[in-house]
Amino acid sequence: MVDTTITVFILVMMFILGAVFGSFACCQAWRWRYHALKKKDLGQWSVCLHCKKRIKWYDNIPIISWLVLRGKCRNCHKEIGIADFLSELSLGVAFLMLSWAYLVPILNNWSVLALHPEFLALRLAIFIVTLMLLVVLMVLAVYDAKWGELPTVLL
């Protein structure tokens, strides 16, 4: 049995990783939209949709920045929108729950699983593929929620 501190640390890190991928999902949805509209002015940095100012790195921290700024741009004080916050939060929670379902049993049964590395590898592969699938589904969900359609860039 693994120490509770390690388990909590892993679960917190997986929540943070999920929030980061939730932020990525929103950015990717916008990139697909720009690609679908054949717009070329999509830069490398996140910008406010209203004032077009570049968002600083410390205003781009998933969940925390949205809460600190109360869902508004630091420069023009216009609403950012709750979709970004919700995707970060929901993917963070989803990563946490999947980690609880897949990783905690692995950590708690490490001595047994070490005798069967093929089972351990299979369980970890299923876990990673499930996380990747969740990220893709979140990108599609954000795209659908914002524009009421699915991107043709996937076809």
What are these model-derived regions, one by one?
Residues M1-L155:
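A membrane-topology feature that recognizes alpha-helical transmembrane segments
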